A protein has these predicted regions:
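Glycine-rich adenosine-cofactor-binding loop
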Residues: 138, 233, 266-276, 280-293, ...
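A short coil-to-beta-strand element that immediately follows conserved catalytic motifs
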Residues: 66-75, 90
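Conserved N-terminal beta-strand and adjoining loop/helix that marks the start
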Residues: 2-24, 75
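Conserved Nudix-box catalytic region and its N-terminal flanking loop in Nudix hydrolases
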Residues: 22-62, 73, 187-191
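Nudix hydrolase/Nudix homology domain
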Residues: 100-153, 158-159
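Catalytic beta/alpha-barrel core
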Residues: 137-143, 160-222, 226-242, 251-253
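Active-site-adjacent beta-strand/loop module that shapes the phosphate/pyrophosphate-binding cleft
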Residues: 76-99
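Glycine-rich phosphate-binding active-site loops on the catalytic face of alpha/beta enzymes
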Residues: 209-219, 249-263, 289-313
Length: 313
């Protein structure tokens, strides 16, 4: 929350993606706010200026990148002790010229998995986590055999799709699924119902664990897990709790009506946006959405989309 004594600014920043998958970062000068830390290039948005225009201007001024085209990725609201910042992160994949520090700042390219070892301003941490995430989270159908599941994994695109296992009990079968996913470069989410399942997830080396809304309500602290921790979010109270616990990701649902839950009220895009945009963690839109809804979902604050029927290959 801002106060009259706390300055507030709006910033737009670029996730500049090279053809090899690396991300271009710059290092803040020591004499600036949050100096000496790595950041996603960008700057302040002038009053009345469109986000895309502001980012194109900043990238040309700072890095000599001409004609940068961008699309929404994630919006974060963050309160520092001395400043309230709203950051609009945008994907940049098209530009002209080689990025270079025109203001004396250091510029360097990093692979996404290298970002976790760098020092960023605190407000950037949710987007650092979000960059590790696939655009789509494919929820495995509950009534599927192991053979069908393994065959489906072979059809997934590991660069764009992750796999969420909601139902599992046989440790050997889950180990086989995780091993095949790792061979295919597919990140795995495993449903966690308690400390034992988190320990199992650790032992299996899965990328993420996911908690239901009911389990989230019972948590008092962030579980001890080195990977991504996700939770189901259906309302503001759950989103706030997930953020306060320092979780990394939320599945916000149901965004739209679904055949699996007939008659259950859906959030709708406007209400879903209130939960997703500005959230302190990465949000996926779940429920009634399809892979083709990604651009619309990002316009409403999500970093990705998730589902069963429209996603399972």
């Amino acid at each position: 929350m801002t106060t009259e004594s706390t300055p507030a600014i709006t910033v737009v920043a670029a996730i500049i993606r090279g053809e090899d998958g690396r991300i271009c970062l710059s290092k803040r000068p020591d004499n600036k706010h949050q100096g000496g830390r790595w950041e996603f290039p960008g700057g302040k948005v002038e009053q009345g200026e469109a986000l895309s225009a502001a980012l194109a201007r900043e990238l040309e001024e700072e890095l000599g990148m001409a004609g940068a085209e961008s699309a929404p990725f994630m919006t974060i609201a963050h309160q520092y002790d001395d400043l309230h910042v709203t950051l609009h992160f945008r994907d940049v994949r098209v530009w002209q010229g080689d990025p270079e520090g025109r203001e004396g700042q250091r510029v360097q390219w990093f692979f996404p998995d290298e970002l976790a070892g760098l020092c960023f301003p605190a407000a950037n941490q949710p987007v650092v986590n979000a960059i590790q995430l696939p655009e789509q989270l494919v929820v495995a159908p509950e009534d599927i055999t192991l053979h069908e599941l393994l065959a489906g994994i072979d059809r997934l695109n590991g660069e764009q799709q992750g796999l969420y296992l909601r139902q599992w009990s046989d440790h050997a079968e889950v180990a086989a699924v995780v091993a095949q996913c790792q061979q295919r470069g597919v990140k795995v989410w495993l449903r966690a119902v308690g400390t034992q399942s988190v320990a199992t997830a650790k032992a299996l080396g899965v990328f993420a664990v996911h908690f239901s809304g009911r389990t989230l309500a019972q948590l008092d602290e962030r579980p001890a897990f080195d990977g991504i921790i996700s939770a189901a979010v259906h309302d503001q109270a759950a989103r706030d709790k997930a953020g306060n616990l320092g979780l990394d990701m939320a599945l916000v649902s149901p965004v739209l009506p679904t055949p699996t839950h007939p008659g259950k009220p859906a959030l709708g895009w406007p209400q879903a946006e209130l939960l997703m945009k500005g959230a302190p963690l990465a949000c996926y839109a779940l429920g009634g959405v399809a892979p083709g809804d990604l651009v619309n979902a990002r316009d409403h604050g999500a970093v990705g989309v998730a589902g069963i029927r429209a996603f399972w290959p």
